[in-house]
């Protein structure tokens, strides 16, 4: 599994790309089985990037048994991942002026097997020249970081409240 189990949540960040250079916005993904053609396409493109990395050893090929185990682990935290993703989108929407593309699900390898709430944030589209310029700006990246930070604090507080009520 690409994730260590001792963490309380997993937030991965990435930059998106699209053949349609007019597409803009940010979105947050959580792990699921690919159910739509779009989800399959997005996951295929994202997962293909692993082949370009120097340390491919971090990404083991998943046997059927490992896929089942990873799916079970991810499923246990699906609702919490949905809550975390929604809070992230809400907080980023307060900070950014680009479109909020919402919370989505796809079978990203980097999210599989997480025994914790786990999401992937796509902070913008490098394929769009305007967003590429924004993403190169330290002040814009700080807005993204601030939004994510506030979302983590808000999510943590919501989890502590739930645990206190149990």
Regions found by a protein language model. Give the residues of each.
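Proline/glycine-rich low-complexity loops and linkers
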Residues: 50-69
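Active-site-adjacent mobile loop/cap segments within catalytic or ligand-binding domains
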Residues: 16, 69-166
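A short, glycine/acidic-enriched catalytic loop
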Residues: 17-52
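Short, solvent-exposed loop/turn segments at the edges of secondary structure
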Residues: 4, 23-24, 37, 114-116
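Short Gly/Ser/Thr- and Asp/Glu-enriched loop/turn motifs at secondary-structure junctions
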Residues: 6, 23, 104-106
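Hydrophobic/aromatic beta-strand patches that form the interior of the parallel beta-sheet core
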Residues: 11, 29, 119-121
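Single conserved hydrophobic/aromatic residue that forms the stacking wall/gate
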Residues: 1-11
């Amino acid at each position: 599994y690409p994730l260590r189990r001792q963490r309380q949540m997993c937030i991965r960040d990435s930059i998106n790309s699209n053949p349609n250079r007019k597409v803009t916005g940010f979105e947050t993904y959580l792990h699921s089985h690919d159910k739509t053609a779009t989800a399959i396409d997005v996951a295929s493109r994202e997962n293909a990037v692993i082949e370009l990395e120097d340390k491919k050893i971090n990404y083991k090929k998943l046997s059927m048994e490992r896929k089942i185990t990873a799916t079970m682990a991810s499923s246990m935290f699906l609702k919490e991942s949905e809550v975390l993703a929604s809070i992230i989108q809400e907080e980023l929407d307060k900070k950014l002026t680009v479109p909020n593309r919402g919370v989505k699900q796809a079978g990203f390898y980097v999210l599989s097997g997480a025994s914790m709430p786990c999401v992937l944030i796509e902070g913008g589209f490098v394929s769009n020249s305007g967003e590429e310029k924004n993403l190169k700006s330290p002040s814009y990246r700080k807005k993204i970081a601030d939004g994510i930070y506030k979302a983590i604090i808000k999510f943590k507080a919501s989890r502590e409240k739930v645990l206190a009520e149990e």
